[in-house]
Amino acid sequence: MLQQKFPAAAKSFFAIDNFTKNLKQDFILSASNEEEALQLYKQALFFSSNENIYYFPSYNTIPYDHTSPNANILSRRAETLIKLTTNNSNSNKLLITHTANLLNKLPPKDFFSKYFLKLSPKMKFTTDELAMFLVENSFTRNASSIDVGEFAVRGEIIDIILSGPKAYRIHFSWGYIESIKEFDIDTQISTKSCRELIISPANEIVLNSETIGNFKNNYLRNFGVNHTDNALYEAVISGRKFTGYEQLLPLFYDSCSNLIDYLNDPIFIFDNLSKKAILEFEHSYNDFYSARSEANKLKFNSFYPTLSPTSLYFTASEITELLEQKNNILLTFENSEQASLIKNIAATSFIEKKTVFDKLFEVIKANSHKKIIIGSSVLSSFERIKSIIQNYEYKYNEINKLDEAKASIINVAIIPLNQSFYTKEYLFITASELLEEKPSSTNTNKKLKNILLELDNLAEGEFVVHKDHGIGQFLKLEALEIKGKPHDFLKILYAGNDKLYIPVESIEVIKKYGNDNAELDKLGSVSWQRSKAKLKKRIKEIALHLIQIAAKRKLNSSASVEFDLEEYDKFCANFPFSETEDQLIAINDIKEDLRNGMLMDRLICGDVGFGKTEVAMRAVFMVAKSLNEHLPQVAVVVPTTILCSQHFSRFIERFKGFGLNIKQLSSVISSKEAKIIRSELESGKINIIIGTHSLLHKNIKFFNLKLLIIDEEQHFGVGQKEFLKSLKSSSHVLAMSATPIPRTLQMSMTGLKELSIIATPPLNRLEVHTSVMPYDPVIIRDALLREHFRGGRSFYVVPRIKDIEDIAKQLKQIVPELSYKIAYGKMTPSKIDEVMSEFYAGKFDILVSTTIIESGIDIAEANTMIIHNADMLGLSQLYQLRGRIGRGKMRGYAYLTVASHKKMTSHSLRRLEIIQNSCALGSGFTIASRDMDLRGFGNLIGEEQSGQIKEVGTELYQEMLEEQIAIFKDESIVSEQPFIPTINLGLSVFIPDNYVADAALKLGLYRRIGNLSNEIEVETFKDEMIDRFGLLPIEFNNLLDIVKIKLLCFKLNIENLDSGDNGFVIKFYKNADMTDKILKFVTTYSNQAKIKPDNKLVYIKKLVDKNIIVEANQLLWNLSEV
C-alpha cells in the first residue's frame, strides 16, 4: 500500500492527477459519506474533461427498509453500472463513490451488457417494442411522464424520463424512429434534437422471465412455500414493481458482483475516514437486520421477508481482504500551511491596514508563475468575485474546465471547493473563504419576517384583507396581458361576485385574514374604512399602554453587573461542547444588557435542544457572582416538576466548585423542607432557586432578586403571569422558549422586548423525520422495535388520560416483547418522579404518558415518538413534544397518528400539515408565528382583543399595532403610507414557471418582494434568488427593477408612472405639493417635459423595451435632483 501526503481539499485533484498519468489503470476514489462523494465527483468533472469519470450514488434509505430509494438514485446507479460494463474504449475509468457501497451486492457484472438500448433517428423500431423494453427494464407507464423512471405513450410518440432528470420525446413513423428530442418536464415542450439516445434500466432489478424465474426459485429456497397471500411475491411474479423490493435484490440473480468487479483491477484511493466507513456500514446493516427479524417474528410485516446480512451484503472482512490484494493509495493529509493560506492573507491585510483583496492581489502577483483559479460553489458569489476583480481593474477568464485555465490572468470558475490549496502548477482560491464575513447586522426581525412570508404563503380560497377595500377571498394567481405583455396579478373575490386584480409588485396591500370564517366586504363600500378608523383609535390606546409598560421598566435603572472574568472563563471552559455562533451572539447580547445600566427584558427564542439552557446558565453566573451586589439571587421558574428536577440536576453539576447554594422548590419537596427553603430565600442564604408554580406565591420573599428566568413561558396561566409581573418590575428578566406565546412574540416583533434567536443546530444534529398517518399497529410495532434494536427507548403520547389504559392494552398485543410504564399529571408527584427516573435509567422501553413530557425531557437514547390522536393537540404542543426526540446524534422519528374514521376540522388538518412540513432544524419561531395565524394574537395586555383582530385579520392588526408603536417612538414617522405607486411600463412582469415551478413557493416569494423597503434589500433579495435558483430570467428581473422604481416613486410622491412608445406620463399624489419641483423640471427639460391641463407631467422620449427601465430611472433621478 502506497501512502501519500496531500492537502485534504485536494483529494479529487490528486485522484485526477493519477488518473490522467496512468491511462491504462482504473481507479476508485472513495468518500467517507454521500455528501463528500458527490462533491468529489463535481470537482473531478472540473479538473478533467475525460468522459470516463463516474459517480455511483448510495441508497437514500436505511438497510432493510420497506420503502424504495429515490427513483433518480435507482436510475443513476443502474446507468453507472451499464456505462462501466459497456465502455469498450481502451481508456481507463475513474469511479467515485461512498465506501459503504462496496458492500452492496449488485447484479452480476455481465448481466447489464444486454440490458441497454441505443436509439437514433431513422432506426427501425416501433412504439410497442420500445414500450415492452421499458416495462421489462423497470420503467412505469403513466398518462404523462413527470418523474424519473416513467414513460408515456401517445399514439406514435413516447416520452421517457431518465436519470438527471433528463426527458426525451421519441417520434415514430411507419415502424421507424423519426426524431428524438429533449423536452422540458414542467412545460412538456420539446427543445433540442438528439442524434442518439442510450436507455438504461430504471432500477438494478430488471423484471423479465429470467429474473422472475430466479426470484421464484430463490424465494422458495429461502422462505418456503407459504407465499400465496404475500402481496410483494404476487406483484413480482406478475412482472410488477413493489415498494421496497430492492431489499431482495440477490433473489433475482444466479450470482452477485461487488462494485470493484465492474472495473479492471482498479487502484483504490482512500483515507482513514473512508476506510472506517466500511466497518460502520457493516455494523449498521447488522443492527437493522436484528430489528427487522424481531419485527417479523409476528406476522405484522409478512410482505417483507428478511434476507440474512450475508445474503444481502458482502462482509467488511471480504471487501477488506479484496482491497489488500490490490495496489491501493492511502491519503494522509497535511493541512497546516495550505489551510492557513487565506487566513494569512486576512491577518496580514489587517496588520498592513489593507483590504483582504488588496493583499490577495499581491499574493497573486507573487504567484504569477502559477495558473490562478478562484472558485465558487454558488452563482451569487461567483458574480460578486467577477465584479470585485473588475473593480481592481484586473482581467479574468471565465472557465468551465481546468484545462481552459490561462497563465498571467485570473481564472474564475463554478467549482465546489471548500478550502484553498496550491500545487506546483496551480493556485486554487475559494470564494467562500475570501467573502467570509461576520454575522450580518441586518435586522433580526426583518430576516425572520422574510422567512415567515415565504413559508406562510397564501393558499387559493383563503380569506385576505386589502388595506383599502376590506375582506376578500384570494382565488388564484392569474397572468393578464398589459399592453400585449404578460403580467402576474392576484385575483381577489369580493361580495356580489366582484373581482379585484392586484399586480404582484403591489402585493403588500394584501394581508392574510387568519380565520376560516369571514364575511366578504363590498367593493366601494364605506363601511370598511369606517371600521378600520374605529379600530385604529383603539389600537392607539393599546400601543400607548404597551409603550408605557416598556418605558416604566427602562426608567428603573440598574447597576451595571460586574463579575470576575477569569472565574467566568473557567465556568465557560467547563461546557463540554463548542458553542454555536447563535449561542455566542445571544450570550454577548445578555452581557450588554446587564452592563448598560437598565433592567434587561429579553426573549431567547431557540429551537428545542439548541442550547438555550446553557445561555441562561451564563446569565445566571454573571448575576449570581456579581461583584457589586450584596447576595444577589436568581430565580428560574419552570412549568413542570419534571423540568424542575432536570434543571436542578444540571445546575448542580454545572455550577460545581463555584460556591453557589442551589435549591429547588416544587411539589416533590416536603412541606418541612419547603418551609426551610422559603426562609433561606428571604435571608439570602440561597443564591439560585429553581421552582415550578410553587415559587409564584405571595409567601415567597426574596432577599435580593436580581434575575428572573422564565423557561417555557407559554405554559404559565394568566394568574401566574400577573404574579410574575410583580417580580419583573425590579429584576432583570430572561424568557426562553422554542415556541413563545403570541403576546411575547408580538412584543419582541414590535421592539418592546429584546429578542435573541438561536437558530443554529448543534454539530451533528439531524432533523426529526415526521409522519402523519392513520393509526396502524403494523407501522407502530415496526417503529417501536426499530428503536429498541438500535439501543433506544420510545415515547407514546396520549392526549387524554382516559385513553391511556386502552393504549397500554394495545401495546401488550402489538409489542409483547417490550416493557412500558405510565405517567400522567394526576399521579402523585413522587410516583411521576419514580417513573421518570426509571425511564432515564433505561429500566423499561416505552413511556406511555400524557403531554406532561412536552417540557424538560432530555434523553439522548429516546428517539422515537408515537402521538395518539395528534389532531387533538395544538401546534406548539406538537412541536414541543417532537422536540423531546432527536436531541443527540441519532435521527428521531415522530409518528403523528389520527383515527382513520374521524373527520378532522380544517384547523386540525392545517396544524398537522404545518408540523409535518416544518421538519427543518430551527423551525420553532416559524411554528409560533403560524400559531398566531391559527389562533390570533390572543391576550396582548390582559383584555380580550379577539373581536378587534377579527375585524381586520391577524396580519393587518399586527401591522397597524407595529406602526402605531413606531409613531409613539418617533413622532416624525407618517402614520400610514397614503398611496401605493402604480407602475405601468409595458414589460413582462412575473416569475416564470421554469424558474420557480412550485406555485406556493412563488406566492411566498411575491409576498417577500412586497416586503422589500429599499434598494439594498432588493439587491440582497436578487443575490439570494441567483444563489437558490440561478440567473434571473428577464421577466423576474423586470419585476425587481419595477419594485426599485416604485420605491423611488413613493419618495417623489408619484402615484402613477405610465410609459408609451413616445415617453412617460407622471401623475403626482393629490395631497403632495410638488408645484415648484415640477415647474423647475419643466424649465430645465423644456424640450421634452410638458404639463397637461390635468396637472400630469409628460416626458417625451422614444422608448424601446430594452432601455425602458434605464430611461425610467434616469427620469426619476433627474426629477429628484432639480
From Swiss-Prot:
What's in the keyword line of the UniProt record? ATP-binding, Cytoplasm, DNA damage, DNA repair, DNA-binding, Helicase, Hydrolase, Nucleotide-binding
Q: Output the Gene3D superfamilies linked to this UniProt entry.
A: 2.40.10.170, 3.40.50.11180, P-loop containing nucleotide triphosphate hydrolases, Penicillin-binding protein 1b domain, Transcription-repair-coupling factor, D7 domain
Record-level GO BP terms = regulation of DNA-templated transcription; transcription-coupled nucleotide-excision repair, DNA damage recognition
The cellular location(s) given in this protein's UniProt record come to: Cytoplasm
Q: Which PROSITE patterns match?
A: HELICASE_ATP_BIND_1, HELICASE_CTER
- Give the EC number(s) listed in the UniProt record: 3.6.4.-
Q: List the disulfide bonds.
A: none
SMART domains found in the cross-reference section = CarD_TRCF (SM01058), DEXDc (SM00487), HELICc (SM00490), TRCF (SM00982)
Q: Which major enzyme category is it?
A: hydrolase
Q: Which family does it belong to?
A: In the N-terminal section; belongs to the UvrB family.
Q: Which NCBIfam families match?
A: mfd
Q: What is this protein called?
A: Transcription-repair-coupling factor
What gene makes this protein? mfd
